[in-house]
């Protein structure tokens, strides 16, 4: 498994990490999954050379962290890079975020809330330190906390040995500059796929200039780029309001994936593997966060690391995706 250094830390990350949002189950994913299969999926990721497991309290109200914690009991702790997040809460107030089922989530990055969250995450995960601690969504009014205050408490947690590295998700360029003003920022998490390339405009160059790893999530657009979505599919749960799952857009994507078949034949790979290989081609700073809910999905995703996509084919795929936006 290819690895990349994490900022100025002594941590190295596999170029592919396991995302566990779906493993957490709950209303966002139309119910819970078989817990043993979820644990087996995490164990398979480790066997395949993936050392990073990403989770968050907001993934079904801590359930994802609990499942990850159960898997961690079966793995050598020093071989796993555990990444979880703070800033999305449900047991204290904050700025309104999403409602999941009948429960309201809030944004809160106050120092008091972060300290509560890190303690709860450590307990759910069953570990005594978190390798990468990431702000999940950035603070907004009315419960606004300046980045300076958030970074201050993260720096304290780092000095206390509770976290090893600091990350930020769902940030813009100004956020990144402000984080760097008050401390180190080792990694960001941003949405990126061949269908959503906005990150290329400013975030990717800024991170390259500052040695910040870019961890991309939703590289398969919540399953749309797996090639398993049929024309009669009706999206529900977390997919229901997504732009690319609107019927007209979804059908365009399905047409594009059919045009990928000659490329899949050339590289002897599947559609999702090709989509992941395209992302890896874009920058050596990129680490893919790829979700899976079954061991075989992990094995398929990892195959993308063995594809040496040519410049010409990467350009062709980009042009196909750009054509969907016209």
From Swiss-Prot:
Residues where NAD(+) binds: 20-21, 54, 189, 217-222, 291, 297
Keyword Secreted tagged: no
EC number(s) reported in the record: 1.1.1.-
Disruption phenotype: Deletion of this gene affects intestinal colonization by E.coli, since a deletion mutant reaches a 1.2-log-lower cecal concentration than the wild-type.
Top EC class of this enzyme: oxidoreductase
Induction summary: Is 3.5-fold up-regulated in vivo in intestinal environment compared to the level for in vitro cultures.
Reactions listed under catalytic activity: hydroxyacetone + NAD(+) = methylglyoxal + NADH + H(+)
InterPro entries (UniProt xref): AKR (IPR020471), AKR_Detox_Biosynth (IPR050523), NADP_OxRdtase_dom (IPR023210), NADP_OxRdtase_dom_sf (IPR036812)
Keyword terms, alphabetized: NAD, Oxidoreductase
Active-site residues, record numbering mapped to chain: 59
CDD domains named among the record's database cross-references: AKR_AKR11B2
A GO term from the CC aspect: cytosol
Gene3D superfamilies listed in its UniProt record: NADP-dependent oxidoreductase domain (3.20.20.100)
Use in biotechnology or industry: Can be used in an engineered metabolic pathway for 1,2-propanediol and 1-propanol production. 1-propanol is a potential fuel substitute to petroleum.
Site features described as Lowers pKa of active site Tyr, chain residue numbers: 85
GO molecular function: methylglyoxal reductase (NADH) activity
Quaternary assembly: Monomer.
Function according to Swiss-Prot or TrEMBL: Catalyzes the NADH-dependent reduction of methylglyoxal (2-oxopropanal) in vitro. It is not known if this activity has physiological significance. Cannot use NADPH as a cosubstrate. Seems to play some role in intestinal colonization.
Similarity comment: Belongs to the aldo/keto reductase family. Aldo/keto reductase 11 subfamily.
Protein name, UniProt field: NADH-specific methylglyoxal reductase
Lineage: Bacteria, Pseudomonadati, Pseudomonadota, Gammaproteobacteria, Enterobacterales
Protein encoded by which gene: ydjG
